[in-house]
Amino acid sequence: MDEYTKIEKIGEGTYGVVYKGRHKATGQVVAMKKIRLENEEEGVPSTAIREISLLKELQHPNIVCLLDVLMQDSRLYLIFEFLSMDLKKYLDSIPSGQYIDTMLVKSYLYQILQGIVFCHSRRVLHRDLKPQNLLIDSKGVIKLADFGLARAFGIPVRVYTHEVVTLWYRAPEVLLGSVRYSTPVDVWSIGTIFAEIATKKPLFHGDSEIDQLFRIFRALGTPNNEVWPEVESLQDYKNSFPKWKGGSLSANVKNIDKDGLDLLAKMLIYDPAKRISARKALLHPYFDDLDKSSLPDNQIRN
């Protein structure tokens, strides 16, 4: 830790306090995440250190770069590149009645998908995507933060400050207790974030797991084995769930054109096996008029 100076505390993350800091030798400004572990006495689990070390290899222009992993007094510090604004703060700063330009919505979604394709191709899931861990710079670049931390540390039910971890972006298979979920959980989250970037409002803002599920069911219809094979055998599925029919997404989501709504519907398909993959989503006609040459990484690398 001697190489870094703490400048100020900038927030509370899911796993602990986040500081703005500076690398003494180079002057580079960084974000320093102090990881607070459930069992402090036991120190940092070796599995967590292994997982985190792998994340240093995730180098992509749409992923916040993990620069360093440091230990001090059995505390783990993760050192990331610094970006001063997250998507949630940005959406909150837009004056009432105004919205993000439609081309920027498209560009942000495309970049988020590029970052996720890169990680999924390396078998890394995010599992906890939300506007707070999408960071933006002044040049229109958006980057995904906190990749792989869910696997390394688990997702706590409450954040360090006792705020409840948000359920708004969580895929229905996770909410229904599936243990065998995979990359489609991130695509669902990105779909809900897409709607929020366009409308400035969360698409499904439940305040408990059941409220979250019911908000999804009201909008999309209550799923059954016909639309989603084996959903009725998931741990938390109840035959007593109200049988909502579901309406059209366009009623809930203004500011997205026909192609955008088609892509959104494909990202919010109940059956994870039928949900569009991030790689296929990048090829959707919604992005046909996006100038990809100006994006930070328009080559999808395997």
From Swiss-Prot:
Its EC number is 2.7.11.22, 2.7.11.23. Pfam families: Pkinase. The modification Phosphoserine is found at S277. GO terms for molecular function: ATP binding; cyclin-dependent protein serine/threonine kinase activity; protein serine kinase activity; protein serine/threonine kinase activity; RNA polymerase II CTD heptapeptide repeat kinase activity. ATP binds at I10, G11, E12, G13, T14, Y15, G16, V17, V18, K33. GO terms for cellular component: cytosol; nucleus. The modification Phosphotyrosine is found at Y15. It is an enzyme of class 2 (transferase). Belongs to the protein kinase superfamily. CMGC Ser/Thr protein kinase family. CDC2/CDKX subfamily. This is Cyclin-dependent kinase 1-A. It comes from Xenopus laevis. The gene is cdk1-a.
